[in-house]
Amino acid sequence: MARVGLPRLAPPTDAALRRALASTAGARLTYDAVGCSLGRARSDDLVEHTWTAVVSGGSDRFERAVEALRSWQVHRGAGLRVVADGPTEVGREVALGVPLLVAQVVAVCRVVAVVDHDDAWGFAYGTLPLHPERGEESFVVSRVRHDVRFTIRAVTPPSWRRPFSALGARRYLRALQRAVDR
Protein backbone atom coordinates (compact mmCIF):
# COMPACT_ATOMS: atom_id res chain seq x y z
CA MET A 1 0.00 0.00 0.00
CA ALA A 2 1.26 3.47 -0.87
CA ARG A 3 2.23 5.79 1.95
CA VAL A 4 2.38 9.53 2.12
CA GLY A 5 5.38 10.69 0.14
CA LEU A 6 7.96 13.10 1.42
CA PRO A 7 7.94 16.67 0.16
CA ARG A 8 10.17 17.20 -2.85
CA LEU A 9 11.78 20.31 -4.25
CA ALA A 10 10.92 19.74 -7.91
CA PRO A 11 7.31 19.47 -9.10
CA PRO A 12 6.24 15.89 -9.80
CA THR A 13 6.05 14.89 -13.46
CA ASP A 14 2.84 13.61 -15.04
CA ALA A 15 4.46 10.15 -15.07
CA ALA A 16 5.10 10.37 -11.31
CA LEU A 17 1.48 11.40 -10.74
CA ARG A 18 0.25 8.46 -12.88
CA ARG A 19 2.39 6.12 -10.74
CA ALA A 20 0.84 7.65 -7.61
CA LEU A 21 -2.64 6.99 -9.05
CA ALA A 22 -1.72 3.39 -9.84
CA SER A 23 -0.26 2.83 -6.38
CA THR A 24 -3.52 3.81 -4.67
CA ALA A 25 -5.95 2.08 -7.04
CA GLY A 26 -8.61 0.31 -4.99
CA ALA A 27 -7.35 1.78 -1.71
CA ARG A 28 -9.83 2.75 1.01
CA LEU A 29 -10.45 6.39 1.77
CA THR A 30 -8.54 7.61 4.83
CA TYR A 31 -11.72 8.75 6.66
CA ASP A 32 -15.20 7.31 7.22
CA ALA A 33 -17.65 10.22 6.90
CA VAL A 34 -18.04 10.13 3.11
CA GLY A 35 -20.08 13.12 1.94
CA CYS A 36 -19.24 15.24 4.99
CA SER A 37 -18.12 18.24 2.93
CA LEU A 38 -21.59 18.36 1.36
CA GLY A 39 -23.45 17.84 4.65
CA ARG A 40 -24.33 14.21 3.85
CA ALA A 41 -22.46 12.71 6.82
CA ARG A 42 -20.99 13.76 10.15
CA SER A 43 -17.76 13.05 11.91
CA ASP A 44 -16.88 14.06 15.46
CA ASP A 45 -13.13 14.09 14.78
CA LEU A 46 -13.21 16.32 11.69
CA VAL A 47 -13.58 20.10 11.51
CA GLU A 48 -15.22 22.01 8.64
CA HIS A 49 -13.75 25.12 7.04
CA THR A 50 -15.72 27.01 4.38
CA TRP A 51 -14.70 29.66 1.89
CA THR A 52 -17.24 31.34 -0.41
CA ALA A 53 -16.87 34.05 -3.01
CA VAL A 54 -19.29 35.73 -5.37
CA VAL A 55 -17.64 35.32 -8.75
CA SER A 56 -19.87 37.60 -10.82
CA GLY A 57 -23.29 37.73 -12.43
CA GLY A 58 -24.67 36.19 -15.58
CA SER A 59 -25.67 32.73 -16.71
CA ASP A 60 -22.81 32.55 -19.23
CA ARG A 61 -20.37 32.95 -16.35
CA PHE A 62 -22.10 30.14 -14.48
CA GLU A 63 -21.57 27.81 -17.45
CA ARG A 64 -17.91 28.86 -17.70
CA ALA A 65 -17.48 28.28 -13.97
CA VAL A 66 -18.98 24.79 -14.27
CA GLU A 67 -16.69 23.93 -17.18
CA ALA A 68 -13.64 25.25 -15.30
CA LEU A 69 -14.44 22.97 -12.36
CA ARG A 70 -15.37 19.95 -14.49
CA SER A 71 -12.12 20.14 -16.50
CA TRP A 72 -9.82 20.65 -13.46
CA GLN A 73 -8.98 24.12 -14.83
CA VAL A 74 -9.58 25.64 -11.38
CA HIS A 75 -7.02 23.30 -9.80
CA ARG A 76 -4.49 23.92 -12.56
CA GLY A 77 -5.12 27.68 -12.34
CA ALA A 78 -4.38 27.48 -8.60
CA GLY A 79 -0.91 26.16 -9.43
CA LEU A 80 -1.49 22.42 -9.03
CA ARG A 81 -0.33 19.78 -11.48
CA VAL A 82 -3.29 17.47 -12.20
CA VAL A 83 -3.53 13.92 -13.55
CA ALA A 84 -6.99 12.33 -13.42
CA ASP A 85 -7.99 8.81 -14.46
CA GLY A 86 -11.08 10.08 -16.29
CA PRO A 87 -13.86 12.65 -16.19
CA THR A 88 -15.07 14.17 -12.94
CA GLU A 89 -17.53 11.53 -11.73
CA VAL A 90 -17.98 9.43 -8.62
CA GLY A 91 -15.18 6.89 -8.27
CA ARG A 92 -12.65 8.71 -10.41
CA GLU A 93 -9.26 9.38 -8.91
CA VAL A 94 -6.96 12.36 -9.27
CA ALA A 95 -3.31 12.88 -8.38
CA LEU A 96 -2.22 16.40 -7.60
CA GLY A 97 1.21 17.97 -7.41
CA VAL A 98 0.71 20.58 -4.70
CA PRO A 99 3.18 23.44 -4.17
CA LEU A 100 3.89 24.27 -0.51
CA LEU A 101 6.20 27.23 0.04
CA VAL A 102 9.55 25.73 -1.06
CA ALA A 103 8.51 22.11 -1.63
CA GLN A 104 5.96 20.05 -3.55
CA VAL A 105 3.85 17.15 -2.32
CA VAL A 106 1.76 14.55 -4.12
CA ALA A 107 -1.84 14.20 -3.01
CA VAL A 108 -4.20 11.51 -4.35
CA CYS A 109 -7.98 11.79 -3.98
CA ARG A 110 -11.14 9.99 -5.13
CA VAL A 111 -14.28 11.80 -6.27
CA VAL A 112 -16.95 10.69 -3.76
CA ALA A 113 -19.90 12.85 -4.86
CA VAL A 114 -21.06 15.02 -7.73
CA VAL A 115 -23.59 17.85 -7.40
CA ASP A 116 -25.47 18.30 -10.67
CA HIS A 117 -28.54 20.57 -10.60
CA ASP A 118 -29.80 23.34 -12.88
CA ASP A 119 -28.33 25.99 -10.58
CA ALA A 120 -25.39 24.14 -9.00
CA TRP A 121 -22.53 21.93 -10.12
CA GLY A 122 -19.55 20.60 -8.26
CA PHE A 123 -17.89 17.63 -6.66
CA ALA A 124 -16.33 16.38 -3.46
CA TYR A 125 -13.20 14.32 -3.25
CA GLY A 126 -11.76 12.37 -0.38
CA THR A 127 -8.21 11.57 0.59
CA LEU A 128 -6.50 8.29 -0.23
CA PRO A 129 -3.40 6.89 1.55
CA LEU A 130 -1.00 8.87 -0.66
CA HIS A 131 -2.14 12.27 0.68
CA PRO A 132 -0.59 14.45 3.41
CA GLU A 133 -4.00 15.08 5.05
CA ARG A 134 -7.12 13.11 5.90
CA GLY A 135 -10.63 14.19 4.99
CA GLU A 136 -12.75 15.59 2.23
CA GLU A 137 -13.03 18.76 0.19
CA SER A 138 -15.88 19.98 -2.01
CA PHE A 139 -15.96 22.56 -4.78
CA VAL A 140 -19.40 23.82 -5.82
CA VAL A 141 -20.47 26.67 -8.08
CA SER A 142 -24.06 27.84 -7.78
CA ARG A 143 -26.27 30.38 -9.44
CA VAL A 144 -28.19 32.50 -6.95
CA ARG A 145 -30.34 35.11 -8.70
CA HIS A 146 -27.82 37.00 -10.85
CA ASP A 147 -24.74 35.93 -8.93
CA VAL A 148 -22.38 33.00 -9.38
CA ARG A 149 -21.03 31.72 -6.08
CA PHE A 150 -18.11 29.40 -5.54
CA THR A 151 -18.01 27.51 -2.25
CA ILE A 152 -15.14 25.36 -1.04
CA ARG A 153 -15.55 23.20 2.07
CA ALA A 154 -12.68 21.29 3.63
CA VAL A 155 -13.46 18.77 6.37
CA THR A 156 -10.26 17.58 8.06
CA PRO A 157 -8.86 16.94 11.53
CA PRO A 158 -7.87 20.06 13.49
CA SER A 159 -4.39 20.82 12.24
CA TRP A 160 -1.61 23.36 12.03
CA ARG A 161 -1.92 23.05 8.25
CA ARG A 162 -5.11 25.16 8.17
CA PRO A 163 -3.21 28.29 7.03
CA PHE A 164 -2.00 26.27 4.00
CA SER A 165 -5.61 25.21 3.26
CA ALA A 166 -6.80 28.82 3.49
CA LEU A 167 -4.05 29.83 1.07
CA GLY A 168 -5.10 27.00 -1.29
CA ALA A 169 -8.75 28.05 -1.09
CA ARG A 170 -7.85 31.63 -2.03
CA ARG A 171 -5.88 30.29 -5.00
CA TYR A 172 -8.88 28.21 -6.14
CA LEU A 173 -11.21 31.22 -5.78
CA ARG A 174 -8.89 33.45 -7.84
CA ALA A 175 -8.42 30.72 -10.46
CA LEU A 176 -12.18 30.37 -10.93
CA GLN A 177 -12.56 34.14 -11.27
CA ARG A 178 -9.86 34.20 -13.96
CA ALA A 179 -11.52 31.29 -15.79
CA VAL A 180 -14.93 32.98 -15.97
CA ASP A 181 -13.45 36.36 -16.94
CA ARG A 182 -11.97 34.95 -20.15
For each predicted feature, which ranges?
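Hydrophobic ligand-binding cavity/cleft-lining segments
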Residues: 1-97
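Hydrophobic-ligand binding "helix-grip"
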Residues: 2, 101-146
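A conserved amphipathic terminal alpha-helix motif
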Residues: 10, 20, 24, 160-182
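General beta-strand recognition
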Residues: 95, 122-124, 149-151
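Compact beta-sheet-dominated globular domain cores
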Residues: 144-149, 153-155
